[in-house]
Amino acid sequence: MTEFKRIPPEQAQALREQGAVLVDVRDPQAFESNHIPDSVHLDNHSIADFIREADLDKPLVVVCYHGNSSQSAAAYLVGQGFSDVYSVDGGFELWRTTYPQETVQG
């Protein structure tokens, strides 16, 4: 079984530019307040539909607050059949510091 990889925001941005799917596992209020453009909010209510509709071979980058919860989510997604999964070290907080222009509200 493939395992997920931990990556810094810079590598996540490179994957994003190459068409990877970004999923944000923070709570809905945090996502609404600020998130990475084109990222998908993923929670217990949306995960089944997301998995059913996803391309399991497309790179998938998981982001949370600080890079901890995203590791559990990434491991779960690997277990669901995704073959190319990444967890962003430092999470959205480090992303926002590294790429302040690459965040949106709403």
Swiss-Prot record:
Protein localization: Cytoplasm
Any GO molecular function: thiosulfate-cyanide sulfurtransferase activity
Pfam annotation, one family: Rhodanese
Source organism per UniProt: Pseudomonas syringae pv. syringae (strain B728a)
GO terms for biological process, alphabetical: glycerol metabolic process
Gene: glpE
Stated role: Transferase that catalyzes the transfer of sulfur from thiosulfate to thiophilic acceptors such as cyanide or dithiols. May function in a CysM-independent thiosulfate assimilation pathway by catalyzing the conversion of thiosulfate to sulfite, which can then be used for L-cysteine biosynthesis.
Classification via CDD domains: GlpE_ST (cd01444)
InterPro entries assigned: GlpE_sulfurtransferase, Rhodanese-like_dom, Rhodanese-like_dom_sf, Thiosulf_sulfurTrfase
Family that this chain belongs to: Belongs to the GlpE family.
Positions of the Rhodanese domain: 16-104
Annotated PROSITE patterns: RHODANESE_3
Cellular component, GO annotation: cytoplasm
Reaction(s) this enzyme catalyzes, per UniProt: thiosulfate + hydrogen cyanide = thiocyanate + sulfite + 2 H(+); thiosulfate + [thioredoxin]-dithiol = [thioredoxin]-disulfide + hydrogen sulfide + sulfite + 2 H(+)
PANTHER family: FAD-DEPENDENT OXIDOREDUCTASE (PTHR43031), THIOSULFATE SULFURTRANSFERASE GLPE (PTHR43031:SF6)
Keywords: Cytoplasm, Transferase
Active site: 64 (cysteine persulfide intermediate)
Protein name according to UniProt: Thiosulfate sulfurtransferase GlpE
Enzyme Commission code(s) on record: 2.8.1.1
Major localisation: cytoplasm
Highest rank taxon of the organism: Bacteria
